[in-house]
């Protein structure tokens, strides 16, 4: 687990003038849904960080802590901050966070706000680039690059089941692949409805699914 913030320990070190920051103050959060990862009970989130200062010939540990007043996630139950580093001779790195699927996600989301900490390698991060929020849930949300017409969670689940892809459809497929997959989904829906006479596939609002 990554070392948390401890200002008393930090004061014992003689540091160079270097710090790290999350790479964008405008993109300071992410949502991780286990519904997009069927069968998985853990998920790895890698948050980009960038060095402020000079690269070093040695790897340098990234330290972070949970901001309790902005979080309802419980460390070691809902998440674990993993050992993370700025690698030698690099100005980029990632803060690694392992999130866990728990029963509570069936009823509510877990929110985790992290703060970058000073340590023996780095001074305090800029205030406006020191926080990052992760929201963990077990819901399906409207994905990037949706190309299948009217959206519903039932249709989204059907697409994931048959394509293995949960999001970013515009970027993972070429135009010809999009047409091919739409054709395959139309066939799959036909087969589903054929196997369920009188009970065709409907969305969560009772509307017939179509592609």
Q: Regions from the language model: what does each represent?
A:
Residues 2-4:
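C-terminal motif of bacterial Sec signal peptides marking the signal peptidase cleavage site
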Residues 84-93:
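Short proline/glycine- and polar residue-rich coil/turn motifs
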Residues 77-79, 85:
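A glycine-rich, hydrophobic loop/mini-helix early in the fold
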Residues 6-61, 68-76, 94, 102-111, ...:
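Intrinsically disordered, low-complexity regulatory regions in eukaryotic proteins
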